[in-house]
Amino acid sequence: VNMPPGQAHKFHRHPAMEEIIYVISGTAEQWVDQTKQILGPGESAHIPTNRVHGTYNAGDTELVFLAILSPAIFEGPALVDVSEDAPWSTLRDE
């Protein structure tokens, strides 16, 4: 994923998939549930199945990262957007 400054994958969840975020370059503000961590190149985060999470470009340069989701085959929605729901809509200033 190539994410320009100020862009994001806002809060969402994957009902049937877990995800690993691996930062190649730039700075990611990674949320898993209501916990935030800052990730730099070579760092990663694991998001368990059905956990709310969001990835934000926290830097002034492009954020480049791998988003690895598993399993690849499942039934139901791949992504559920919760960015407008409480408490997710109030966790950060935009």
What are these regions (language model features)?
Residues 1-14:
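Conserved short histidine dyad/triad with adjacent acidic residue
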Residues 10-11, 30-31, 47, 53-59:
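Short beta-strand His + acidic residue motifs that chelate non-heme Fe in jelly-roll/DSBH
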Residues 16-28, 33:
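Glycine- and acidic-residue-biased ligand/ion/polar-headgroup-sensing regions
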Residues 1, 21, 45:
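Conserved GNAT-family N-acetyltransferase fold
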Residues 1, 54-94:
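Double-stranded beta-helix
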Residues 34-50:
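Short acidic-glycine-tyrosine-enriched beta hairpin
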